[in-house]
Design a protein with these regions (language model features):
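Cofactor-/ligand-binding subdomain signature composed of acidic, glycine-rich
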Residues: 1-40, 62
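Cofactor-binding active-site loop characterized by glycine-rich and histidine/acidic residues
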Residues: 28-32, 38-111
Length: 111
């Protein structure tokens, strides 16, 4: 890691791994539930891109804001958006990050 301008500690690398696993498990759940018809609207999965979002978000501060694409679940999770609120949002339920009105493609957390 001599040439790496962003050397990471073992704890930071472990946290990055945990974040990537959380994203993947979240996406796998959505994939199954969408295939069963349990989710209203459309779902654009982020699976396979976990490292990109995690690596970027771990270098942002709490005050930094992000804007994502229609495949933004991983960005949101890596930035620290509450996973339960995200799941409620995707299912169109109250208590979601946008009170269930944004769905998969319009997850937002302005806090």
């Amino acid at each position: 890691m001599a040439g790496n301008p962003f050397p990471q500690s073992k704890a930071q690398l472990l946290q990055a791994y945990r974040t990537m696993r959380t994203i993947r498990e979240f996406e796998e759940r959505l994939h199954v539930d969408f295939a069963r018809g349990d989710i209203p609207g459309f779902v654009h999965l982020y699976a396979g891109e976990e490292a990109a979002g995690t690596g970027i978000m771990m270098h942002l501060g709490d005050g930094d804001r992000i804007a994502s694409t229609h495949r933004g679940h991983g960005h949101c999770i890596a930035k620290g958006v509450d996973v339960t609120a995200m799941m409620k949002e995707i299912y169109g339920r109250r208590g979601g990050s946008c009170e269930g009105k944004g769905g998969s493609m319009h997850i937002a957390d302005l806090d």
